[in-house]
């Protein structure tokens, strides 16, 4: 059982330690804790017994343990604070013209990396929730073509493919027609089911030879299931993570899955501190936060760093970036949905 004073002591030690990275002694706490040095030392000893503090080898001071950081995140972190003094600099960073969604997400990731010194990941709306709003096939050569998908009227995905040997030019038109008639307006998840249920029967009616047609459907739609992910500050991992964690970030789709699984459907923010799960990020801290992508859904920003982070400062920063990012995205999508020649 941690008393109120002990919690204040733990919070103060974490605050000092994350700024100085030096063990904290009782004298450093006396100005802020209205108790004698002996009382503070006794409370520090009790926190150490509970595993929330640990002794430094070269000093009489104490520093937070992993369990101490976990306790702090669970009991003391304020998710609703907004660092007003940082708003101006963040707004200024977004005060430029962006030409695609990925550039806006990259700016947010770069900004958080610069502020935190950590690695940052930004995720678009979950692929399965996005809707196919336009489709076309562009013939590139005698034997190659490009499938062009537009998702949510804003994101373009392409898939290059070899035209099957048994395909005539009219077969490409049939393929395009089926996709436009059956899939437009549907979510990627719906399309996934349709390819496995409706399409096998439909191609029997449309194609004289059905060899490779289902395989072609699977191939050209495969890219739509990939996460739209941007990263920044990967090299920072070398300062606080092992080689396995660094190499893990060479697999962006696995990184996206790890980040997404760390945030429940009903959570807007979460902080994981060395949660011990079987993961390359198990010994690290992950601060993740959802942000609104107007007209489309929610994305996720995640900061990955060492356990001894200044959590309150990072929560403040990610809150500000979230709000400014949503404002920028609102403007971006309002422009996309308007008549170009009426926008000034």
From Swiss-Prot:
Keyword Transcription regulation on entry: yes
GO BP term, pick one: negative regulation of DNA-templated transcription
Family: Belongs to the HrcA family.
InterPro entries named among the record's database cross-references: GAF-like_dom_sf (IPR029016), HrcA (IPR002571), HrcA_C (IPR021153), WH-like_DNA-bd_sf (IPR036388), WH_DNA-bd_sf (IPR036390), WHTH_HrcA_DNA-bd (IPR005104), WHTH_transcript_rep_HrcA_IDD (IPR023120)
Protein name: Heat-inducible transcription repressor HrcA
The organism of origin for this protein: Streptococcus pneumoniae serotype 2 (strain D39 / NCTC 7466)
Gene3D superfamilies for the chain: 3.30.450.40, Heat-inducible transcription repressor hrca homolog, domain 3 (3.30.390.60), Winged helix-like DNA-binding domain superfamily/Winged helix DNA-binding domain (1.10.10.10)
UniProt-listed NCBIfam families: hrcA (TIGR00331)
């Amino acid at each position: 059982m941690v008393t109120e004073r002990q919690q204040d002591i733990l919070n103060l030690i974490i605050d000092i330690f994350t700024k100085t990275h030096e063990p904290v002694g009782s004298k450093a706490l006396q100005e802020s804790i209205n108790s004698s040095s002996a009382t503070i030392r006794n409370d520090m000893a009790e926190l150490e017994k509970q595993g929330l503090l640990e002794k430094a080898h070269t000093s009489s001071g104490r520093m937070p343990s992993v369990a101490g950081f976990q306790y702090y995140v669970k009991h003391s972190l304020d998710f609703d604070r907004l660092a007003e003094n940082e708003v101006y600099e963040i707004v200024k960073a977004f005060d430029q013209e962006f030409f695609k969604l990925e550039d806006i997400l990259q700016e947010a990731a770069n900004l958080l990396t610069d502020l935190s010194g950590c690695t940052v990941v930004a995720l678009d709306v979950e692929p399965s929730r996005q809707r196919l709003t336009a489709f076309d096939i562009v013939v590139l050569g005698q034997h190659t073509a490009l499938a062009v998908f537009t998702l949510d009227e804003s994101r373009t995905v392409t898939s290059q493919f070899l035209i099957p040997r048994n395909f005539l030019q009219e077969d490409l038109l049939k393929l395009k027609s089926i996709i436009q008639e059956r899939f437009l307006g549907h979510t990627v998840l719906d399309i996934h089911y349709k390819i496995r249920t409706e399409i096998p029967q439909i191609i029997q009616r449309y194609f004289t030879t059905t060899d490779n047609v289902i395989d072609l459907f699977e191939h050209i739609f495969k890219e739509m299931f990939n996460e739209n992910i941007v990263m920044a500050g990967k090299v920072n991992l070398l300062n606080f993570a092992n080689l396995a964690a660094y190499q893990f970030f060479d697999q962006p789709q696995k990184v996206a899955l790890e980040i997404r699984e760390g945030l429940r459907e009903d959570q807007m923010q979460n902080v994981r501190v060395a949660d011990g799960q079987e993961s390359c990020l198990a010994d690290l801290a992950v601060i993740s936060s959802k942000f609104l992508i107007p007209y489309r859904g929610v994305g996720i920003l995640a900061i990955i760093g060492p356990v001894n982070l200044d959590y309150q400062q990072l929560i403040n920063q990610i809150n500000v970036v979230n709000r400014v990012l949503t404002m920028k995205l609102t403007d971006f999508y309002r422009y996309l949905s308007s008549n170009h020649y009426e926008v000034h």
